[in-house]
Design a protein with these regions (language model features):
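Conserved loop-to-beta-strand segment in the C-terminal subdomain of adenylate-forming
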Residues: 47
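Catalytic core of pol beta-like nucleotidyltransferases
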Residues: 1-32, 39-44, 54-104
Length: 104
């Protein structure tokens, strides 16, 4: 998988994880990678799909701040972030069944 910034797939995901960790801080939350990146089928035009599920509501602006940090980062892919608490039940089930749990 080639990238415009010469980052390997593992380095790209490592950078995304670092940013997610910085923005979420010590808040309890499960972070899932799902979609083509989780299946190992990503291409240079694939976006990175993340879902976040926190036991307590995230403070206002947290996801917006996360999206902004990811956009401004060196990650050469679009990163979609979904709050599972606000997701459709069928979509939530799909993510929980097929997504890769990054952190808890």
């Amino acid at each position: 998988m080639g990238t415009s910034h010469n980052l390997t797939a593992s380095k790209v995901l490592e950078e995304v994880r670092r940013i997610v960790g910085e923005v979420l801080g010590d808040r309890k939350a499960s972070v899932y990678l799902f979609g083509s990146w989780a299946r190992g089928e990503a291409t240079r035009t694939s976006d990175i799909d993340l879902a976040i599920e926190a036991p307590a509501p995230l403070p206002p602006g947290t996801l917006a701040r996360l999206r902004e940090r990811l956009e401004e980062s060196s990650v050469p892919y679009r990163v979609e972030v979904v709050d599972l608490k606000e997701a459709d039940p069928a979509f939530r089930r799909h993510v929980l069944e097929e997504g890769l749990l990054w952190s808890d």
